[in-house]
């Protein structure tokens, strides 16, 4: 089978996902096009250099609707003969774009792809596209639907994680992210966002809160207690599904959950012939990809079974992995992953994660693949695994191996 190699990976800084965020003035198409242009410039791509642009995006309405991927191609300097494909696997959309591109290459359907994703959460509100699982009684009732924050608290309750553990993990994420920026660990991958006059709009992640302490987080109110206990009473729904739970321990709040931000990320993937034709050296190969469906109520446990699946399918064990990126959607997701595999925290999200820098839904999967590769190179390690939990009960994973 043909190998699929990563030749480059880059991302924009993440802006606060509010009207006062630095990227709020930039449209989804413009930011996507800016990143595609940067990828082409960095690798010297001209003409019909890639087979397709596969772009992950979750909230595909308004300016993010109508096949954003194709709109981005047309707004960029890429050749108009390059098509575009927008995909949505919720929070793993960016990863699924990369995985789909890699598997297309392995199957012989093209020599190279640009894959990644975007989410402009300040411009297109999360959930504004609707969701049948949340509003259709024919689906909501039999699946025991609860919002993601309740699901995160169910994980904490089921597996015994405390508020103190979650807050400590969040503080460490902030510390690691601040250190990574101070040591320029992201410099290789960051594409600054400029305005039409060439002036810098944003050149670093702006959501971070360096210096956050456990005492600071202890002052925050649990975000999902009211919707669980008062109206509409989702704790009751959870306990109907899991009658062994006497109550739900609400440990999550804004500080130990992922931040709402704007951002985009891209990965250039190609076969060996593509690299030789363009004078590019491969940085890593995509060794394996996987996705899986899980219980939709607890919803966010997907990283565990999908990691088991990808390791089994690739003939590997957890000990074969040097570094891990587990999306910090909520603290309990990462705590459960480390508990399930007895993985040292020293190997997981070593440069911080979404609790510190934010989670631009459609982009995050591609972001963590790029971050993982950069850190493997910095430490001169070989193999990394990236994984995300996914809304409605799914998981996705990618294993990369330096070459």
What do these predicted ranges mean?
Residues 179, 266-288, 304-312, 329-343, ...:
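Condensing-enzyme catalytic core of the thiolase-fold
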Residues 10-13, 24-29, 33-34, 42, ...:
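N-terminal extracellular/periplasmic Venus flytrap/periplasmic-binding protein-like
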Residues 57-111, 131, 143-150, 218-259, ...:
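Conserved catalytic cysteine-centered active-site region
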Residues 87-118, 156-186, 266-273, 360-381, ...:
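Active-site-proximal alpha-helical scaffold in enzymes
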Residues 1-17:
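N-terminal amphipathic/basic leader segments beginning at the initiator methionine
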Residues 14-37, 41, 59-62, 85-99, ...:
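Active-site pocket-shaping loop/turn-to-helix segments
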Residues 22-113, 117-134, 190-204, 297, ...:
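Conserved beta-ketoacyl condensing-enzyme motif
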């Amino acid at each position: 089978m043909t190998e699929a190699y990563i030749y480059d990976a880059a991302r924009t800084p993440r802006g606060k996902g509010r009207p006062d965020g630095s990227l709020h003035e930039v449209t989804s198409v413009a930011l996507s096009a800016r990143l595609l242009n940067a990828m082409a410039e960095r690798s010297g791509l001209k003409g019909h250099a890639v087979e397709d642009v596969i772009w992950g995006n979750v909230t595909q309405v308004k300016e993010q609707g109508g096949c954003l991927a194709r709109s981005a191609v047309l707004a960029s300097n890429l050749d108009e003969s390059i098509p575009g494909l927008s995909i949505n696997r919720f929070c793993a959309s960016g990863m699924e774009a990369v995985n789909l591109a890699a598997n297309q290459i392995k199957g012989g359907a093209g020599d190279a792809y640009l894959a990644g994703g975007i989410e402009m959460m300040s411009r297109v509100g999360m959930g504004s596209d609707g969701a049948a699982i949340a509003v259709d009684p024919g689906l909501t009732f039999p699946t025991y639907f609860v919002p993601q924050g309740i699901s995160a608290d169910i994980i904490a309750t089921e597996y015994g994680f405390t508020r103190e553990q979650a807050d400590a993990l969040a503080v460490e994420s902030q510390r690691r992210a601040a250190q990574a920026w101070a040591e320029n660990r992201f410099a290789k991958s960051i594409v600054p966002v400029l305005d039409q006059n060439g002036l810098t709009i944003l050149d670093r992640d702006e959501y971070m809160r360096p210096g956050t302490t456990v005492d600071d987080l202890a002052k925050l109110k649990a975000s999902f207690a009211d919707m669980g206990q008062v109206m509409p009473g989702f704790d009751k729904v959870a306990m109907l599904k899991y009658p062994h739970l006497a109550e739900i321990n609400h440990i999550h709040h804004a500080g130990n959950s992922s931040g709402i931000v704007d951002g985009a990320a891209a990965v250039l993937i190609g076969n060996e012939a593509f690299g030789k034709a363009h004078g590019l050296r491969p940085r890593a190969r995509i060794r394996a990809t996987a996705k899986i469906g899980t219980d939709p109520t607890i919803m966010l446990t997907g990283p565990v079974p999908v990691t088991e699946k990808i390791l089994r399918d690739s003939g590997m064990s957890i000990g074969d992995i040097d570094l891990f990126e587990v999306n910090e959607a909520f603290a309990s997701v990462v705590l459960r992953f480390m508990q399930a595999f007895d993985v040292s925290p020293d190997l997981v999200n070593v440069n911080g994660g979404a609790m510190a820098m934010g989670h631009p839904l459609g982009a995050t999967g591609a972001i963590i693949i790029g971050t993982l590769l950069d850190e493997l190179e910095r430490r001169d390690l070989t193999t990394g695994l990236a994984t995300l939990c996914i809304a409605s009960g799914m998981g996705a994973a990618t294993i990369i191996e330096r070459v």
